[in-house]
Amino acid sequence: VNDAGLIGTVGISGSIKADGDVRVDVKSEKGIGLRANSVGDHSEYTGEVIVKTNNGTAVGAVGYSGSDDASIKIDPVTGKKVQLLGDVKHFTKYGTQGALIDISLKTADSFLTGASIGANGADRITNLSFDNASTWNMAGDSVVNALINNNNAVIDLTQGADTLNVTDYSGTGGKFVMDTDLASETNGDKIAITGATAGITYVQVKDSSLLSGIEVTGNKSLLLITDTSEKATFTGKHLNAGGIWDVTPTIENGADVTKADGSTGSKKEWYLTKIEKVINNDTGVLLSAMDNSYALWRNTNDSLRKRLGDLRFRDNTVDGDGIWARYNGGKFAGSGFDSGYNMYQLGYDKADNAKSTYGFAIDSGNANARYGTGSGKDKLFAGSIYGTWHGDNSSYTDVVARFGQFDTD
């Protein structure tokens, strides 16, 4: 289905049982991809489901007062992906006999990008399950009745949401990604859970201090999660969101937190209390690449100085002007890198008199570098002009002007 019709266009509606793959692309604004009405519509999708909307609703249930119930279930068989671009939404303010939206995402390439809207825990139920590194990019404040966050799944509140309310929470090994401002001790995303089963969930943060560059110090605590059941466990996990730093937050239970005013939190609360920043792998590779390029440049300089040393033993009364060539290859290493290189030099010397020689040279070289977390290739092209003057008592003066360009991948 590919529908570019009027605003409010619906892709698929009614009672549908689809074992095969389903793809819906609603190009009109505020359209609905998959819909069930509370007039007895019951839909089940067990194959691949891909729904794209234009600022619309990927999956929606519409209820009418006094009507029959309705449901949409997306439960793909093993290996099938679910990709939903748009909200998951109950379209009604009426009490109905029951409207259910139940969606399971089971693969690493499965995602929901949108909010969960309209669930109330009574006659409008939304159940969402994320497993096996699937992702929820939460584009707005959301309410979910049953939420499963399991096995490296990611629920990311930094995509436009501020709050997530969950009636029943379960899972272990999943992640929450949250916007925070530890320095303020008030601003940040919030998660409220009514009931939970035992399990460990990781928390990653994008703190405002990463943008401001201001280090957060002192006794700070920012409430992130409230679990009324006191059953779930939350712990900090490092996050590499690009930029310079890996960020590892310290997440502590409220019972172990003493606030700046001397009060303590409660066992149902989970606080961000500290942020540790370390240079991430991407930055480490860049720094090592700079060191490697500098080392290669130094090696070519050393080779040119060696040529100038040869000139000091030249007998200008015998040796004439001429072209010279040199190859230099080998390996070098430093902190965090090692490299093998090949360098070719071609030059011309002009003997002005018995004590003065001038010349120019061009260099071309390459290197293959290995870093702790990556690899790279360097290409160098450089040019030099030089002069050497011999004085009495074996004294000498060398002057070199050198320019060049590195290309590093």
Label every model-predicted segment.
Residues 21, 35, 48, 71, ...:
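Extracellular Ser/Thr- and Pro-rich, acidic-biased low-complexity repeat/linker "stalks"
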